[in-house]
């Protein structure tokens, strides 16, 4: 289900505040955030935001195609290491 139009999109206040301050100063530093559920706004274009994946912060450069999506969509939280292969004898090889 999508969010109600009367509520508007969610963006963490601390994140939007940092973006606005950097836009006023003309800076382009990496911003760390744990807010994966924040919606990407047009004001964020050109910035690099380090989004937490549960273990580390992964830098994400914001482009035009990302506007309207959530930050968490661009940072995976799980790593797939592949299925285990079997040898001729039936023992597993990693």
UniProtKB/Swiss-Prot annotation:
The keyword Protein biosynthesis does not apply. InterPro entries: Ribosomal_uS19, Ribosomal_uS19_bac-type, Ribosomal_uS19_CS, Ribosomal_uS19_SF. Pfam families: Ribosomal_S19 (PF00203). GO terms for cellular component: cytoplasm; small ribosomal subunit. GO terms for biological process: ribosomal small subunit assembly; translation. Keywords: Ribonucleoprotein, Ribosomal protein, RNA-binding, rRNA-binding. One of its GO terms (molecular function) is rRNA binding. It comes from the Bacteria. Transmembrane segments: none annotated. Belongs to the universal ribosomal protein uS19 family. Protein S19 forms a complex with S13 that binds strongly to the 16S ribosomal RNA. This is Small ribosomal subunit protein uS19.
């Amino acid at each position: 289900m999508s969010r109600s139009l009367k509520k508007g999109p969610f963006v963490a206040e601390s994140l939007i505040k940092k973006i606005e301050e950097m836009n006023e100063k003309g800076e382009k530093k990496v911003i760390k955030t744990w807010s994966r559920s924040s919606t990407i706004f047009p004001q964020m274009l050109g910035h690099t935001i380090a989004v937490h994946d549960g273990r580390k912060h992964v830098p994400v450069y914001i482009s035009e195609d990302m506007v309207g999506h959530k930050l968490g969509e661009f940072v995976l939280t799980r790593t797939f290491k592949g299925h285990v292969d079997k040898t001729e004898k039936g023992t597993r090889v990693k």
